[in-house]
Amino acid sequence: MKKFLTTLALTLFFINTSQSQFNKIQTNDFDIISTSMQLDYVLGHAIRCSHNALDFHRRLFEYDPKEKIFVMFQDFGDYGNGGATSLPNNLISTCISPMNYSFESSVAGERVFSIMNHELVHIAALDNASKSDLSYQKFFGGKVKSSNDHPISMFYSYLTSPRYYSPRWLHEGIAVFVETWMDGGKGNALGNYDEMFFRTRVLENSRIY
């Protein structure tokens, strides 16, 4: 009996230890999780930045998300960055390491604020569905993610989320412009990597906004 209780106590200890590595905050619009206890300090700030950005994009893009947006904060890379997708669900992955300034221009002290502004533009641009998109999503039971094993799935995926297949330069151009605008004129639009988008718009005498 003593051996059983000792084993049970050790098991519960390790279970609690493993679960405590992750912290999660849920709101009506977001599920935000950190992958390490060392990142928990940023969650409160992250949820405020996420809601501020989403409220801004709601007004700008007339975007009304139909599902929660999952945000994961991690520190798996050497430089801060983010990624976003709308397939099959809305997901943002954010590395909160210091930014790389070799080809980019960002707000160093507020990289969480800047990254969330940028990545939520992607979510709004990718997930903002028309009536036909919503009809196909209802028909297929959600947004379809394409599979390399079944190339025809790309067609079904396009029907449910056509803006996912827009050129990357278009999505990045929108995101860096709005991000820089929201950051008060300091952002990736000033970096030489993304500046090509605006040079092209000026060269073609096209309307930027």
What are these regions (language model features)?
Residues 4-16:
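Sec-dependent N-terminal signal peptides
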Residues 10, 18-19, 62, 180:
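Residue-level marker of positions within ordered structural domains that often coincide
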Residues 20-160:
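Juxtacatalytic substrate-recognition/specificity segment
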Residues 53, 128, 132-208:
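Post-HExxH zinc-binding segment in Zn-dependent metallohydrolases
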